[in-house]
């Protein structure tokens, strides 16, 4: 894959739920937004955690990139492709679409 692909919320959730799935969901929203609510099992990807991601995730594993509305994730997805990741997807609609579909999220209580 030389360029990232788009993926719907339903397709992404289905991919993540497959029994033998190695797919990783990364959330690139700011720390405050991520702290308030994020998808269950999402990895918070920032400039500071990029090296950690590259050390923990094989380049062959599918990576799904999520932002707020599906715009910023496209640039981040292409960046990951350029770093050597082979299967990268930008989540259409971002976190807002994930929340609208009532998919599992971790929410700060307070």
Swiss-Prot record:
Catalytic residues of the enzyme: 67 (cysteine persulfide intermediate)
Keywords: Cytoplasm, Transferase
Superkingdom classification of source: Bacteria
GO cellular component: cytoplasm
CDD domains associated with the record: GlpE_ST
GO molecular function: thiosulfate-cyanide sulfurtransferase activity
Pfam families assigned to the protein according to its UniProt record, in alphabetical order: Rhodanese (PF00581)
Compartments it resides in: Cytoplasm
Entry EC number(s): 2.8.1.1
Catalytic reaction equation(s): thiosulfate + hydrogen cyanide = thiocyanate + sulfite + 2 H(+); thiosulfate + [thioredoxin]-dithiol = [thioredoxin]-disulfide + hydrogen sulfide + sulfite + 2 H(+)
Statement: the UniProt record of this protein carries the keyword Transferase: yes
GO biological process: glycerol metabolic process
Record bears the keyword Cytoplasm: yes
UniProt xrefs under SMART domains: RHOD
Rhodanese domain boundaries: 19-107
Chief subcellular location: cytoplasm
Protein family according to the UniProt entry: Belongs to the GlpE family.
Function comment: Transferase that catalyzes the transfer of sulfur from thiosulfate to thiophilic acceptors such as cyanide or dithiols. May function in a CysM-independent thiosulfate assimilation pathway by catalyzing the conversion of thiosulfate to sulfite, which can then be used for L-cysteine biosynthesis.
Protein name, entry field: Thiosulfate sulfurtransferase GlpE
Gene: glpE
């Amino acid at each position: 894959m030389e360029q990232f692909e788009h993926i719907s919320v339903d397709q992404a959730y289905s991919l993540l739920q497959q029994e033998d799935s190695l797919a990783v969901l990364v959330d690139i929203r700011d720390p405050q937004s991520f702290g308030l609510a994020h998808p269950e099992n999402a990895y918070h990807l920032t400039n500071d955690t990029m090296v950690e991601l590259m050390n923990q995730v094989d380049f062959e594993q599918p990576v799904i990139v999520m932002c707020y509305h599906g715009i910023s994730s496209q640039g981040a997805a292409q960046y990951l492709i350029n770093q050597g990741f082979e299967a990268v997807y930008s989540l259409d609609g971002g976190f807002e679409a994930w929340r609208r579909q009532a998919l599992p999220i971790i929410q700060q209580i307070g």
